[in-house]
């Protein structure tokens, strides 16, 4: 067999390397062992196993060094050599009995009268510690002991049980047990009983229990105790009685070892409780005694009771009631109910748990079985009352029935009930739990509320045009973090307060199983348009819009019709505002709308086409069809409005009406002379020719259209233009389409509302009422409406305010949703366009239409390099707040037809804010273009001017290396950039520091001449290098 190492042997013997090394070094081995890697021969391994596996006997030497201190020392007794291990085991019981008698005799002389009432059955006796196999705990547990207390047995039962079953039962050792050990049973003797006798009732003992116990114990010490005469108050006696009933019950009772461990200290205290029921304060002390270390208890249990009796006098127990010494006599009272006879295990009462039977132990061969708990001996009513008082105390001892109830309660608290989802909401009776004392019922604690899916009708929510993330999460009943996570999955970076548009909210709600509906304010109900009865309708004047290209004579034509001079008041001779006029002709009234012809006023032309009945398209006979002419044609066709073409400037030389007809026919306007349906009228606004024919055609077309309206109802119309008048506040030019607007009516106009305080016509004359197709200026609105907003008269101002606030909220939420919606794609684009410059503008204009035209025209100028951002736009003069905003946002203020006050001008100068004033939109657009070009970076183009070859180098102190060169191509100029090439590779790129020919500085050197050149901050010039000279040409950007 191969040699074994120390660590392998330690693994076989189930011990650590260090412990085995210590044991090996203590043994006299032929070969010294130094570490766990040392090798051992076969004979050494056998010797070590024989010495270590065979347990050594121990004896405990005790010496009392004080009234309460006992010193114990273990004395190892080497077993006889050559004795086999198997033969030593049967002798252990007898050897233990002898050592128990010796140890008991040593402790007889120790006076410990006070310790007599201690719960002797709780602690282990000393003879167990003096067993021969006490060196190793596991070997000691397997060794049988003559008499063991209940707590120690309960701790060792799980290990004792298998060994006790495996070993053959040795002969009974009842006679071997000395009388001194039996004297430890402190209780009154009873007549002999069978295995489960029913004892007679016993009267409670007087308070001086310790003295009586001492007398009984002394009496028992003088005479050998018989097993059948042992009282039932001792738990060990009960265990013996149970074991005598039959050995087959022993394995069934072994699994209850842990229950005995908890219950044995309580059961052992039951009889003393009955004898002294008047001391409830000692229960806690008894529990402390039960938890004391085991080393102190054997000495108490071994002391002979006869020796303790003389040391105690009658008044002593009363004087020492408050100390821990007498706690064992005051734990619990004896039960008064009669004990039921022992029944089979299938009956209601469970058999008392027993300690496992082993050689020399309770219930084993040689020792009568000991019952687990004392029998019910009855008691007086006072004892019953005291028992009821202390029934619920944890630290007090209880009867077997009380113990079982306590453990059942404990188990019931740990029990977990499975509650179905439907039971959580089931409020039917019968789900209540009674209290500890049978009081009022307590409701069972419900589990956490489960998340349930609402019904389909509840999974439908209504939202406005936009909703915040937090509000949507609240509506859906989920956390906002879940919504944000889903938004990130959709590529949208959102916060809790960010606004979401309707479409995004629909997608999010669908993921959580909800349907979304638009919760529009019931404007349709409040502002419902009523259909007019035919008998209430009457003819109304036509609304005619004059459209055409710029400088084709639209306003001049209208002036000729109105016999006014509007053109003279226009800046630059062009119309920049939309105007509404009511003209009286011999055949009736006509409402005219004059629109600007400049390309910037597209929105104005579109608005005019929407509210008009007939469009007069003015085309100059000498100029023909222009881009804005085509645009006006498209607007009119989109609105479904008939067009009358007025060929103007027929008095000028070069007028060609046929050319106009040809070009317009290409756009779908075929004249009547050519078989079409478009009316062409040749006029001259300057000479006032053809005006009557034009008005006649307009009225004829109106008759064909049968224009009618109901004047006897609340007015409805559209805002043609709006502005802020310094003295009158917000002023809106409106065109009434149906109904009649009176002064004092409450109106809603876009997001604003108000009461009409005054009305004026185009000549600034006050009006009391404005009927259908009548333009008017109204005052009294809460703000400046947008051009094109619908104006509606209502009955109640409260309704108007409600509609206005709802519209304002919806508009604000929509703007927030657009501005704050940041997606991953947009973020990437912004990162890519990090070098894009922004030109911030603040637009202040006289009317809303001009602002609209300026904003659209300027934002079209944005390019890839410069973005135009309109920070703020409003009507009215430049205010201090505008200057402050411009200073913060680094913006330029564009003032169109407005002027600031001197105070504002001074503030702008202090804040270094640039204010630009314009009265013609052309100039504003051109200057903004120049500003954009100035912000754009120029490009540079490289031009090679010449090449020179280095033929020699010179080093000049404080100057550096000078290259003597020969110009081979082109010419060399002083301001050129130079590039040094060596073998075709660029070595350096910089500037010329000097250029000389001989000793003279020169500006340039032509081809075929030699010169000296110095390169700035570079001296590594070698013969054979080539110097390439070039210059950069700046190419300024051009705005497309």
Swiss-Prot record:
Compositional bias annotation for Basic and acidic residues: 112-126, 198-214, 231-300, 394-403
Name used for this protein in its record: Translation initiation factor IF-2
Record keyword Protein biosynthesis present: yes
GO cellular component terms, A-Z: cytosol
NCBIfam families named among the record's database cross-references: IF-2, small_GTP
Species the sequence originates in: Desulfatibacillum aliphaticivorans
Domain called tr-type G: residue spans: 539-706
Residue segments, region G4: 648-651
